[in-house]
Amino acid sequence: MATESPATRRVQVAEHPRLLKLKEMFNSKFGSIPKFYVRAPGRVNIIGEHIDYCGYSVLPMAVEQDVLIAVEPVKTYALQLANTNPLYPDFSTSANNIQIDKTKPLWHNYFLCGLKGIQEHFGLSNLTGMNCLVDGNIPPSSGLSSSSALVCCAGLVTLTVLGRNLSKVELAEICAKSERYIGTEGGGMDQSISFLAEEGTAKLIEFSPLRATDVKLPSGAVFVIANSCVEMNKAATSHFNIRVMECRLAAKLLAKYKSLQWDKVLRLEEVQAKLGISLEEMLLVTEDALHPEPYNPEEICRCLGISLEELRTQILSPNTQDVLIFKLYQRAKHVYSEAARVLQFKKICEEAPENMVQLLGELMNQSHMSCRDMYECSCPELDQLVDICRKFGAQGSRLTGAGWGGCTVSMVPADKLPSFLANVHKAYYQRSDGSLAPEKQSLFATKPGGGALVLLEA
């Protein structure tokens, strides 16, 4: 249940090769044995892209890949972080002087986000120190939310070290808020599914208030992740934050057009809620109120009756101050149509008609087209990969995660899975230039996994 704390489970470490290896590496690194372990999963968003931060429901599931941290509280105030991957250097600092550098999305900063979120929630000035060894098997910058899984894992680590309790919902909200310390204006989907996920089911995640509903996926289909091998680091690019701002500006212009108090409006969902109309009707309002040609800052100011200075200081975020072009019509059209597709997807899953897989696949395909054409968050490699997946039997295929690289998710009839994997591997990954990542991490079927939990050695 969402109101419960994350589970604590006792395990025989010797029976779990990854845990055993982590324990041995921890002992080698710190000269002691971990007191406990925490795991938090990555996720794949099946449908509902770039709409969580606009206030709309999304439909993700946790993947089996996760971040796993071995932890030992210490009596000093020193925080020592190490990673099993040599690409990520060791880091140490005082637990009472947490500094997060927004300009550098270094791996340890994501841990610090989770720690700081819990510290601030409880208003603690003195935190106990800890030694932590991090191991992750979620491909980084792939759109499977490795960074948010690390934030969530660190939040639960800190909570456990403190001996405090919070519900899964509270933890998800704290971690979503604290990830913004690193400059990412996300909406909370990644953190919510990391805590609220349950094995065997996808979840409809709703916001304000945060809640999760089981969505039973079709039994005759398998979801396959395929990595384009184009890395996209969310916090290191302005693309993501520009989209957040375009949605905010679109919401304000739509509110002004409908004579609402626009200055209080931040999200596209708020406009719909205030007008009390359907998503389909909101698409018609968007057609009337906004034009397809890009807006410049001066035109936005004219529409809202404000100065450029007011636009910059009161509305734009620090990292969008210098943007000269805003595509408001396209972004609003994507958000309202994608929000409708999420609800249709859930409805089809509930009603389970005979042609369920075909109908769900069509929604996934429409979602990708909207991400590509209206939200412009795809890239040539993702489009090529989606085409290949559909060609070899996927009923639906789309980019998943922020986009601009990362992964696709495809819904494949279970009986076609072996030939699908073989053909996609041959068509996309077996290239003469040898520049792509190992296929094992890049192409795999997945089923809904469980959420974050604490592991104690039995």
UniProtKB/Swiss-Prot annotation:
Site label Transition state stabilizer, positions: R43
PROSITE patterns, alphabetized: GALACTOKINASE (PS00106), GHMP_KINASES_ATP (PS00627)
Gene3D superfamilies: 1.20.1440.340, 3.30.230.10, 3.30.70.3170
Record: active site: D190 (proton acceptor)
GO cellular component: cytosol
Subunit structure: Monomer.
GO molecular function, one term: ATP binding
Superkingdom in the source lineage: Eukaryota
Amino acids binding ATP: G143, S145, S146, N233, K234
Chemical reaction(s) catalysed: N-acetyl-alpha-D-galactosamine + ATP = N-acetyl-alpha-D-galactosamine 1-phosphate + ADP + H(+)
Summary of the function given for this chain in its UniProt record: Acts on GalNAc. Also acts as a galactokinase when galactose is present at high concentrations. May be involved in a salvage pathway for the reutilization of free GalNAc derived from the degradation of complex carbohydrates.
Enzyme category, top tier: transferase
Protein name from the UniProt record: N-acetylgalactosamine kinase
Keywords attached to this entry: ATP-binding, Kinase, Nucleotide-binding, Transferase
GO biological process: carbohydrate metabolic process; galactose metabolic process
Family to which the UniProt record says this protein belongs: Belongs to the GHMP kinase family. GalK subfamily.
Binding site for alpha-D-galactose: R43, E49, H50, D52, D190
UniProt-listed Enzyme Commission number(s): 2.7.1.157
